């Protein structure tokens, strides 16, 4: 099965769903709202007299309440600018994008209960539609978007990195599912190469879709360290690999399935992201910063409660692609193992996560 068919967050609204276990990305989105507000204000300052409608896309929207916050923030800022500039009523067209496997039903069910859609009596009329497809390619007509937003999505790769088997067909990243301290250099290079290729495709597609002077607000999980095997970027996948390895030892998973599985994700450094944007040359970097955050689970004093909540959050975004490789029937055992490993080996300590915030403007010309 291709990545685009297996990569999505846990569906529905149950106890293991992404909708119920996305508090960390909600925290990140909340902290970066001032950046989005400033981006909307900047759009009006550039060419507000030309605006009749603002076309916006949220790429990789999943089913998180983040999407509702993004729409409400943009709508509120548009209403504010309309009052300040005494301009005509504007329309807000929002496209919600994710891969076809995303639970758009749950997304729109929540959206209709939280965001006023299509109300002509408001200063800004809001219209929303879903756009399934991969953001690594074109999704919209040329020069049709003024604002692109994406939170914790652009780090996902279009496929597992190429070149992770030897000439003899042997796995080069044995007993691991991502970069680790024991991974050979070729694994690190393969992951960076795949991210470079995919993020370049992402930028190229958006450069055709975004109008001149339009902008993008991108938030990615990343790392402060230059070392891609640092714990801040490898924590989740490293411990899941250990948990899967224990299930292999118990005969519940075939070892070959572990050795041949590599997660299609990459946590870049700020320097790597900056280098790719500058090499592409379609956008200027208006703002770029990295910041660290504790996970919300760290607020829990009891380490078992803390880690059990962490395991649910991890399960919400990893289970679909993990179960596609290893089978649905062992998922409960796997995440129980994950919980036990974090508590027993790390005493419930969870490293901080680095987020990269990037504001890009489309170059005129």
Curated annotation (Swiss-Prot):
List positions binding S-adenosyl-L-homocysteine: 18, 61, 66, 98-99, 134-135
Q: List all disulphide bridges recorded for this chain.
A: none
Needed co-factor(s): Mg(2+)
Q: Which GO terms describe its biological process?
A: methylation
Q: Which InterPro entries match?
A: MeTrfase_7 (IPR005299), MeTrfase_capping (IPR042086), SAM-dependent_MTases_sf (IPR029063)
Kindly list the positions annotated as binding Mg(2+): 173, 259, 261-262
Top-tier EC class: transferase
User: Which key words tag this protein in UniProt?
Assistant: Magnesium, Metal-binding, Methyltransferase, Transferase
- Free-text remark on how the cofactor is bound: Binds 1 Mg(2+) ion per subunit.
Query: What GO MF annotations does this protein's record show?
Result: metal ion binding; methyltransferase activity
Supply the EC number(s): 2.1.1.-
Please list the residues that bind caffeine: 25, 152, 155-156, 317
Biochemical pathway: Alkaloid biosynthesis
Q: Where is this site: Involved in substrate discrimination?
A: 149, 221, 265, 313, 328
**What is the superkingdom listed in this entry's lineage?**
Eukaryota
Q: What does this protein do?
A: May be involved in the biosynthesis of caffeine.
What PANTHER family does the database record attribute to this sequence? S-ADENOSYL-L-METHIONINE:CARBOXYL METHYLTRANSFERASE FAMILY PROTEIN
Q: Which family does it belong to?
A: Belongs to the methyltransferase superfamily. Type-7 methyltransferase family.
| Official protein name in the record | Probable caffeine synthase 5
This protein's species is Camellia sinensis
| Record lineage | Eukaryota, Viridiplantae, Streptophyta, Embryophyta, Tracheophyta
